[in-house]
Amino acid sequence: MNTTQQTVLNGTPCIMLSAGGYEAYIAYEIGSNVIRLRDVKNGIDVFRFSPDNTEETLKQSAEVWGLPTLYLPNRFADGVLKTSDAVYHLPVNEAAPYHNHIHGFLHKRVHTVISHHADENCAVLRTSYDYDEKDPFFKYLPLRFRVELTFTLSEYGLEHKFALINLSEKALPVSVATHTTIQAPFLDGAKPENMRLTVPIGKRCELNERCLPTERLLDLKLSDLEYKNGTKCPMLQNLDNDMYQAEAGKLDGQDFYGVIVEDEPTGKKICYEVSPEYKFWIIWNDKGFNGYFCPEPMTAMIDAPNLGLPADVTGYQELKPHGVFEANQRFFTV
């Protein structure tokens, strides 16, 4: 039977969804982070998870556990964000030599539970966050907006639907990502060296020493092609913000816009599908020996509003007053 319920996971208030052989715990007070997604039947933990994590641990390092949703993700040079009708100065929260603003604030805010319910097909949670003068970040970015998140769990996995609504009278920058943390190994009893990652990619986006785009798009080298042909081990080596244009790949002979992680000895896979709004992948693994890696889908390049490249290359867009932007993701195992 599919269910939803209010619960507490080691001190962290959550809504638990159970459906289709999966269980998901969403910490609505920590940015609606999916702090655990488990395929119960196959013994797979999709996202980085520790049963010892307290609420305080998750709050202090929200970017590196579960599925954190980021608004204004990754880096903005010197904290500057230029839109078509304004220039905003965000706090520089990444120290020298980087000196950038990084990752925004949405993933650290207390979200509101709108509703949760289950039926014979699925279990659903809807949360929201209203950004206005009450948010301490508003002095840097005085643009009202609303974020609505819908999580649907079923036999088809977990769907994550993101909606951004501009409630201001000015242009609202659109740059959205999830700092997706994949447990490594993800299968009970498996070994990280047996994992292989497939990421269908186009050009590599060159980054400078501050982890900002040089605006050069590079042809793929042999190490890049390991992502494309599915031979890349995402652990036990340092993958440090490898950034690429996203392309479509194949899953069981069908077009698949997303990444696939496989445990080679068993053939078990995590399939991570995203909607076309996500135009870039960044791969990062915290030096490769900490039990997780991050295939991060982004709707726009790092520092996109400040770049000289055209919007159809950077992915950057803006919402007019009362406009709505939506993007979707789905996680499932095979």
Task: Write out the residue ranges for each language-model feature.
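Beta-strand-rich N-terminal accessory domains
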Residues: 1-95, 252-278, 287, 323-332
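Extended, loop-rich substrate-binding clefts of extracytoplasmic carbohydrate-active enzymes
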Residues: 1-9, 18, 86, 91-154
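Acidic, contiguous internal or C-terminal segments within carbohydrate-active enzymes
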Residues: 17, 28, 39, 129-180, ...
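Short, conserved secondary-structure segments in the cores of folded domains
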Residues: 77-78, 137, 315
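A short, structured loop/turn motif at beta-sheet edges
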Residues: 82-86, 115-125, 152-157, 186, ...
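Active-site/ligand-binding surface loops and adjacent short beta/alpha elements
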Residues: 89, 171-172, 181-275
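Acidic/His-leaning functional-site neighborhoods
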Residues: 100-112, 116, 230-314
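Intrinsically disordered, low-complexity Pro/Gly/Ser/Thr-rich segments with frequent PxxP/GP/PP motifs
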Residues: 314-325
